[in-house]
Amino acid sequence: MAKNVLHTIRERGFLDGQFLIAMPGMFDTNFARTVIFVCAHSEDGAMGFILNRPQRLTFPDVLLHLQLLDPDEAIRLPSATREFQIQAGGPVETGRGFVLHSDDYLSDSSIPVSDDICLTATLDIVRAISRGEGPLKATMLLGYAGWGPGQLEAEITQNGWLTCPAQEELIFSRDLDEKYDRALALMGVSPAMLSTDSGHA
């Protein structure tokens, strides 16, 4: 994980622990109909993870790529481990893996990003998950979404995003297709109510 990302996470801001929900007029196709969990926000910028974009790689693919097991071992992995979900976390540093997880797993490299959720970006958690010793709730994301100083605030002011407090159940839900509508429902909003001219929360 890049040092500047770690620094950003340690600097807390008012959007920490919030969902960003893309408005219909989102100009950047990377973020159309996305739900993003903001892990860090400060005067230096912001960092978060897209929660509803699939990733073609499987967890065994990741283990093989990292040389944490050989092909014969991959075949013998428990079904729960083989089916561990990998998601596309954002367009920045797409070759880097990050694990968002419940706070029942902590290592020296785990960073709290909300009251109940941590972020770990080292191989120890990948090994733990492969052995069935990982956190109760977790999702692995490749890449992240990042904003420079003032950039996210400007996008919100320009009606690019709705914001609301994050919900743990939605963060770890495996049903990616429903996350956008479910995030809107947290605010009492339906997609039909939105237009490109709507205001922000």
Curated annotation (Swiss-Prot):
Pfam families: DUF179 (PF02622). Belongs to the UPF0301 (AlgH) family. PANTHER family: UNCHARACTERIZED PROTEIN YQGE, UPF0301 PROTEIN YQGE. InterPro entries: AlgH-like (IPR003774). This is UPF0301 protein R00917. GO terms for cellular component: cytosol. Coiled coil: none annotated.
